[in-house]
Design a protein with these regions (language model features):
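N-terminal signal-anchor transmembrane segment
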Residues: 1-45, 58-77
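Membrane-interface alpha helices of multi-pass inner-membrane proteins
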Residues: 9-14, 186-201, 368-374
Length: 411
């Protein structure tokens, strides 16, 4: 169990700079989990365990259901001209299903995870973040303004980084009991991922990251003196101002896009996103498993050319609609949209299932995915799906009743 736990943490943290091996390690963790479920697990009291963890189990089932919606669609509608969409959804769906299976085993065996493993995982996560900074710096040094590392685009890289930052914060919160050391690790993590996200210049991810940090500060500082609140807000404001200055070109571009949209010119980046949201609703498939990607594209293209004449939107809709719910509804039909809504609902419920005690990491994770999913599609890229699924596994373990010996080890 401890080996699987460490493998998953390493998989998440190394995904952007080590090619192929993180996915292989993920599969190894999955196979070990399946082996544990079939041959090694003690099933005594299983029914009682299910009842006491029903919300967490519902969240795991929603992950499996979400993966199944992607996998089934890719098998029913094998596109001839948009093969990469089919391949990504096939691989991503499979990885999400395996994440749910692995999480089930680790959740059942969470009491076996030692305090030393939690500390090692936290340190590993921070070190891998620093290594990502190094590889990102090397990429910028050769003249690439918006780094993408091993992902398919800078935006994908940024979304993975936000998920990695949530995992890093959560592991630090779990493993470091000394308030001073924890604060130092928090600050280091904040600087690491602020710099990484700045190198991607992805506005949505940077905004989401600062919201995540603010919510985390609210939980961590709720019982401290007001002057510490002031210092924390001052630090975030200063760094945020520095990032805003560094990204002023992208901010001016966004402002210009909004001005153009007010003049009914939707042929801009932001304008095209509003057009895609409208088109996605009009071409949504009310069938159970959705429609072919080419069929959706042709319907959406005709609608946009008739109502908006936005060349930017027509170019983008070939692959996705820049919104997770609209994307699922328009492509994977009723099954897809129900699956992703259940994922969000059960995820938020699982983060606050205990009275007066939140799973802060899971809450931040779900909030980040929801916010980023409003302006882009997260599950279309297989590596993103793997990181999201694997991160859910770890975060779900961070606040379980079975972890009493972790608390004892701190005392």
């Amino acid at each position: 169990v401890n080996i699987i736990f460490i493998l998953i943490v390493f998989t998440i943290g190394s995904d952007l700079f080590i090619e192929a091996y993180p996915r292989k390690l993920f599969y190894i963790g999955c196979y070990l989990s399946i082996f544990g479920l079939l041959f090694l697990e003690n099933w005594k009291g299983f029914r009682q365990w299910l009842l006491s963890n029903k919300i967490a189990i519902a969240f795991l089932l929603s992950i499996v259901l979400l993966g199944a919606s992607k996998l089934i669609w890719s098998m029913i509608f094998p596109s001839t001209h948009l093969q990469d969409i089919k391949d990504n959804y096939y691989a991503g769906g499979k990885l999400l299903i395996l994440s749910g299976v692995m999480a089930f085993y680790l959740l059942k065996s969470v009491s076996v995870i030692s305090f030393q493993s939690w500390k090692f995982a936290a340190c590993t996560s921070v070190v891998l973040g620093l290594l990502t900074v190094w590889f990102g710096y090397q990429e910028q040094a050769i003249g690439i303004n918006r780094i993408k590392l091993l992902a398919d685009a800078a935006t994908t890289t940024a979304y993975i980084m936000v998920v990695q930052s949530v995992l890093c914060f959560s592991l630090i919160k779990k493993a470091v009991s000394n308030q001073l050391y924890r604060t130092v690790f928090y600050i280091a993590t904040f600087f690491i991922f602020s710099y990484l996200l700045l190198m991607t210049e992805t506005r949505g991810a940077i905004g989401t990251f600062f919201i995540v940090c603010f919510v985390l500060a609210c939980f961590e500082l709720r019982n401290v003196k007001p002057r510490y609140w002031f210092l924390a807000l001052l630090a975030i404001s200063v760094i945020g101002g520095g990032i805003a200055y560094k990204m002023q070109k992208r901010i001016v571009e966004a402002y210009d896009n909004i001005q153009q949209l007010q003049k009914n010119n939707a042929n801009t980046s932001l304008g095209a996103r509003f057009v895609m949201l409208d088109a996605g609703q009009h071409v949504a498939s009310f069938s159970l498993f959705g429609q072919d990607a080419e069929q959706r594209y042709n319907k959406a293209r005709q609608y946009i050319e008739k109502n908006y004449k936005s060349a930017e939107a027509v170019r983008a809709i070939k692959y996705h609609f820049h919104n997770d719910i609209i994307e699922s509804f328009s492509l994977q039909g009723l099954f897809g949209v129900i699956a992703i809504i259940l994922f969000y609902v059960t995820g938020f419920l699982a983060s606050c299932e205990k009275k007066n005690k939140f799973n802060v990491g899971l809450l931040l994770y779900m909030s980040a995915l929801f916010l980023m999913g409003l302006t882009d599609v997260l599950f279309i890229q297989r590596n993103t799906a793997m990181v999201i699924g694997a991160c859910a596994v770890i975060l779900l373990l961070c606040q379980r009743d079975e972890n009493k010996k972790i608390e004892n080890a701190r005392q």
